[in-house]
C-alpha cells in the first residue's frame, strides 16, 4: 500500500532514519512504516457536554484503524462551548474557533504528511472547522459526529438547553417561579452529547451525512448509545478503504453534494448557521456557491420534520423515525437529490439509499408524509433590500405572521438589547436592531440566542421582529433576520438606522427594507464614521482584519 502514500516522505530512505526513530517512540515497529499514517483529529474536552464523549470515540477509532492496517496518530483540536459562552464576550470567539480548528487540522495533517484524517467533533464549530480543513487538505477523510444529547424531562415535557434559555425570559416576565427555573436548569442537559434539537451541531452533522462525508444514520445517533462507538469503528474501516482506493474529498465535495446538503437542511428545518458554514466549506472546496442557491432550493423543498426549536421532537426521535436516510430517500425519489453523487464509501447516494423505504413509517410523527409537510417550502429564506444589499438570512418557522412593519429599537450590542427585554421595555410591534455584532464589528458574529429566547419567554415571539448583523443559534426561532450584510462596521445600511425608523420584514416576499428616503439615507451615510476596532491585539484583532462578509461565509483566507 505504501506506493501511493504521501507519508513516504517521512518514513522511507536513509535520510529519514531520525524521523523513523521518533515514530518508533510513539509505537511504530519495523513493519509499520509501509502502512498509511492516519490522523485522528479529536475534539475531546470537558469544557462542554457536546465533546465529553469524544475521547472514547477517538480510542475506538484508533483501535479500528490499527485493525484495518493503518497507523493512527491522535491529536487534539480546540472547542468553544457556544451554550456556555452565549450572551457573554466569550461568544465572540465561537466563530473564530471554526477557523482555528480548520487551521490546526490542516497544519497537523500537512506538517506530518498524514495519508488521511478521521475528524471527530461535537460542538457547533467543530463540524465546519473540520470540513473546511478536509476540503483544503484533499486527502482521504471521514467525519465522525460525537452524537446528540438525550432530552431532559420535566413536568412531562422534553427539555433541551434552549428550554433553559427560554425559562429566563419566562421568569423575567413572571410566568414561572424560581423553583421551576432551577428545575429546568437542573434537568435540561442530562449527559454527554451535542444540543438535542435540530440546532447547529445536529444540522451540520446531518449535512455531512447528506454530502457523503459521514456514514449513513451516524448524524442522529445519541452520544451515549453503543451504536455511536460502533459507527466510529466502521468509519475508520471505511477511511482505510478510501485511502487504498484514493477516494478524495474533491470527488465527494462537489456542487451536487452541496445541493444535496441544502435540500436536506431545508427538509429537516435546520439552523441558519448552515448557510454561513456551507458557504465557507464550498470556498475551501473551490465549489461555486452563493446565497441565491439556498433560495432556489428552498423554493422547491418542503419542511418535512417536526423538530425543535419550533417543533415538537429532538434528534434522537428523528433517529428512531428513520434518520437522515429516510429524509434523503423521500427527496431522491422526487428528483430533489442527486443520486449519482459519490460518498466516502465509494458508493453513490442512490446506492447507499437503495434499501431505505420511499415513505416514512406511519407509527411516527417526526417525519411528515410528503403530502402533509410541516411547511410547503423551505424555512431558510434569503432576504434582500436596502437594509441588506448583499443579503440576509431569515428563519421563518414557528411564527404565525411572517411579515412585520414597525418602529426600530436600536442597540449597538447584544447586552444593551438584553437589558431592555428583561426590563420590559420592548413592546409588541417593535423591530429590534442589534448591530456592530458582525464578523468584523463584533468581532466574531455572536449568536443572539439570549435575546431571542428572552423574547419567546416573554410571550413576544409573534409580536416583534429582530434583525442583526450577528448570527442566531440553531435554537432560535421567531421573526428573526440575521447575517445582515454589509454589516454595520463597514458602513452597511444597518449602521444608519435611527430609533423610531420604520422597518419592514416580509419573509414571503423575501424583503427587508428601511422605510427612509434615499436622500435621508445619503445624508446619514455622509455623517457616519467607522468606529474604532474593539480589539487591537490577539486573535480577535487578527480575525477582524482578515474576515470577509457573512454573505461569502465569513472566511479568513479569501486573499485572491
Swiss-Prot record:
Mg(2+) binds at residues 82, 124-125, 447. One of its GO terms (molecular function) is dihydroxy-acid dehydratase activity. [2Fe-2S] cluster binds at residues 50, 123, 195. Pfam families: ILV_EDD_C (PF24877), ILVD_EDD_N (PF00920). The active site is at residue 473. Its cofactor is [2Fe-2S] cluster; Mg(2+). GO terms for biological process: branched-chain amino acid biosynthetic process; isoleucine biosynthetic process; L-valine biosynthetic process. InterPro entries: DHAD_IlvD/Edd, Dihydro-acid_dehy_C, DihydroxyA_deHydtase, DiOHA_6PGluconate_deHydtase_CS, ILV_EDD_C, ILV_EDD_N, IlvD/EDD_N. Pathway: Amino-acid biosynthesis; L-isoleucine biosynthesis; L-isoleucine from 2-oxobutanoate: step 3/4; Amino-acid biosynthesis; L-valine biosynthesis; L-valine from pyruvate: step 3/4. It is an enzyme of class 4 (lyase). Keywords: 2Fe-2S, Amino-acid biosynthesis, Branched-chain amino acid biosynthesis, Iron, Iron-sulfur, Lyase, Magnesium, Metal-binding. Its EC number is 4.2.1.9. Functions in the biosynthesis of branched-chain amino acids. Catalyzes the dehydration of (2R,3R)-2,3-dihydroxy-3-methylpentanoate (2,3-dihydroxy-3-methylvalerate) into 2-oxo-3-methylpentanoate (2-oxo-3-methylvalerate) and of (2R)-2,3-dihydroxy-3-methylbutanoate (2,3-dihydroxyisovalerate) into 2-oxo-3-methylbutanoate (2-oxoisovalerate), the penultimate precursor to L-isoleucine and L-valine, respectively. Belongs to the IlvD/Edd family. NCBIfam families: ilvD (TIGR00110), PRK00911.1 (NF002068). This is Dihydroxy-acid dehydratase. The gene is ilvD.
Amino acid at each position: 500500500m505504501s506506493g501511493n502514500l504521501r507519508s513516504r516522505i517521512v518514513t522511507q530512505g536513509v535520510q529519514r532514519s531520525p524521523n523513523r526513530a521518533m515514530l518508533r517512540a510513539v509505537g511504530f515497529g519495523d513493519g509499520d512504516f509501509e502502512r498509511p499514517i492516519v490522523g485522528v483529529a479529536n475534539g475531546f474536552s470537558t469544557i462542554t457536554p457536546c465533546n465529553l464523549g469524544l475521547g472514547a470515540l477517538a480510542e475506538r477509532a484508533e483501535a479500528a484503524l490499527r485493525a484495518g492496517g493503518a497507523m493512527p496518530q491522535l491529536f487534539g483540536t480546540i472547542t468553544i462551548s457556544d451554550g456556555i459562552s452565549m450572551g457573554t464576550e466569550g461568544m465572540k470567539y465561537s466563530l473564530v474557533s471554526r477557523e482555528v480548528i480548520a487551521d490546526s487540522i490542516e497544519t497537523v495533517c500537512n506538517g506530518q504528511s498524514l495519508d488521511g484524517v478521521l475528524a471527530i467533533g461535537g460542538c457547533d464549530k467543530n463540524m465546519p472547522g473540520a470540513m473546511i480543513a478536509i476540503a483544503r487538505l484533499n486527502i482521504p477523510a471521514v467525519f465522525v459526529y460525537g452524537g446528540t444529547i438525550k432530552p431532559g424531562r420535566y413536568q412531562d415535557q422534553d427539555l433541551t438547553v434552549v428550554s433553559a434559555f427560554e425559562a429566563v425570559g419566562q421568569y423575567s416576565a413572571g410566568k414561572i417561579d424560581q423553583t421551576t427555573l432551577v428545575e429546568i436548569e437542573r434537568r435540561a442537559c442530562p449527559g454527554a452529547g451535542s444540543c438535542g434539537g435540530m440546532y447547529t451541531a445536529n444540522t451540520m452533522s446531518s449535512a455531512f451525512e447528506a454530502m457523503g462525508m459521514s456514514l449513513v444514520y451516524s448524524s442522529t445517533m445519541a452520544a451515549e448509545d453503543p451504536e455511536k462507538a460502533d459507527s466510529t469503528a466502521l468509519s475508520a474501516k471505511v477511511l482505510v478503504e478510501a485511502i487504498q482506493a484514493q477516494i478524495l474529498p474533491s470527488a465527494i465535495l462537489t456542487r451536487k453534494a452541496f445541493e444535496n446538503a441544502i435540500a436536506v437542511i431545508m427538509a429537516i428545518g435546520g439552523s441558519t448557521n448552515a448557510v454561513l458554514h456551507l458557504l465557507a466549506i464550498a470556498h475551501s472546496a473551490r465549489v461555486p456557491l452563493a446565497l441565491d442557491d439556498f433560495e432556489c432550493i428552498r423554493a422547491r423543498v418542503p419542511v418535512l420534520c417536526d423538530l425543535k426549536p419550533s417543533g415538537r421532537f429532538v434528534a434522537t426521535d428523528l433517529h428512531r423515525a428513520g434518520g437522515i436516510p429516510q429524509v434523503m430517500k423521500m427527496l431522491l425519489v422526487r428528483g430533489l437529490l442527486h443520486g449519482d453523487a459519490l460518498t466516502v464509501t465509494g458508493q453513490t447516494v442512490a446506492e447507499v439509499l437503495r434499501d431505505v423505504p420511499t415513505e416514512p413509517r406511519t407509527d411516527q410523527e417526526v417525519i411528515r408524509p410528503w403530502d402533509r409537510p410541516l411547511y410547503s417550502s423551505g424555512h431558510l429564506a434569503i432576504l434582500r433590500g436596502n437594509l441588506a444589499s448583499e443579503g440576509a438570512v431569515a428563519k421563518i418557522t414557528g411564527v404565525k405572521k411572517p411579515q412585520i412593519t414597525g418602529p426600530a429599537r436600536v442597540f449597538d450590542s447584544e447586552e444593551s438589547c438584553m437589558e431592555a427585554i428583561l426590563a420590559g421595555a420592548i413592546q409588541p410591534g417593535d423591530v429590534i436592531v442589534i448591530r456592530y455584532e458582525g464578523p468584523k464589528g463584533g468581532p466574531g458574529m455572536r449568536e443572539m440566542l439570549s435575546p431571542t429566547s428572552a423574547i419567546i419567554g416573554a410571550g413576544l415571539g409573534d409580536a416583534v421582529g429582530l434583525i442583526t448583523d450577528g448570527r442566531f443559534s440553531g435554537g432560535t426561532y421567531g421573526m428573526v433576520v440575521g447575517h445582515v450584510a454589509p454589516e454595520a462596521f463597514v458602513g452597511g445600511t444597518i449602521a444608519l438606522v435611527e430609533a423610531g425608523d420604520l422597518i419592514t420584514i416580509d419573509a414571503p416576499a423575501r424583503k427587508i427594507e428601511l422605510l427612509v428616503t434615499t436622500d435621508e439615507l445619503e445624508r446619514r451615510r455622509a455623517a457616519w464614521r467607522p468606529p474604532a476596532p474593539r480589539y487591537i491585539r490577539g486573535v480577535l484583532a487578527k480575525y477582524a482584519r482578515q474576515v470577509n462578509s457573512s454573505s461569502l461565509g465569513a472566511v479568513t483566507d479569501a486573499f485572491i
